[in-house]
Amino acid sequence: MAKDDVIQMQGEVLENLPNATFRVKLENGHVVLGHISGKMRMNYIRILPGDKVTVELTPYDLSRARIVFRTK
């Protein structure tokens, strides 16, 4: 999949789930399932409920997302 196909959005982490998965509420009100990207996992970046994150969604499955950036 090309990088051009992704949709980037801002959201807030609602809760931690097993296997580095999180429930994220997007700015538009939708709640999606997000997992940590590989670079964030390799650099041991911690994500806690309440953190603001940037997620990437594919146009094929809008219920799942990849967390690519965490802001304070």
From Swiss-Prot:
Q: What is its main location?
A: cytoplasm
- Protein name per Swiss-Prot or TrEMBL: Translation initiation factor IF-1 2
Its biological function? One of the essential components for the initiation of protein synthesis. Stabilizes the binding of IF-2 and IF-3 on the 30S subunit to which N-formylmethionyl-tRNA(fMet) subsequently binds. Helps modulate mRNA selection, yielding the 30S pre-initiation complex (PIC). Upon addition of the 50S ribosomal subunit IF-1, IF-2 and IF-3 are released leaving the mature 70S translation initiation complex.
Name of the coding gene: infA2
Q: Which organism is it from?
A: Cupriavidus necator (strain ATCC 17699 / DSM 428 / KCTC 22496 / NCIMB 10442 / H16 / Stanier 337)
List cellular component terms (GO).
cytosol
The subunit structure is: Component of the 30S ribosomal translation pre-initiation complex which assembles on the 30S ribosome in the order IF-2 and IF-3, IF-1 and N-formylmethionyl-tRNA(fMet); mRNA recruitment can occur at any time during PIC assembly.
Annotated GO molecular function terms are: ribosome binding; rRNA binding; translation initiation factor activity
Q: Localized where?
A: Cytoplasm
Which family would the database say this protein is a member of? Belongs to the IF-1 family.
UniProt keyword rRNA-binding present: yes
Claim: Membrane is one of the keywords in the record? no
PANTHER family, per the entry: TRANSLATION INITIATION FACTOR IF-1, CHLOROPLASTIC
Q: Which UniProt keywords apply?
A: Cytoplasm, Initiation factor, Protein biosynthesis, RNA-binding, rRNA-binding
The S1-like domain is annotated at: 1-72
SMART domains from the xrefs?
S1 (SM00316)
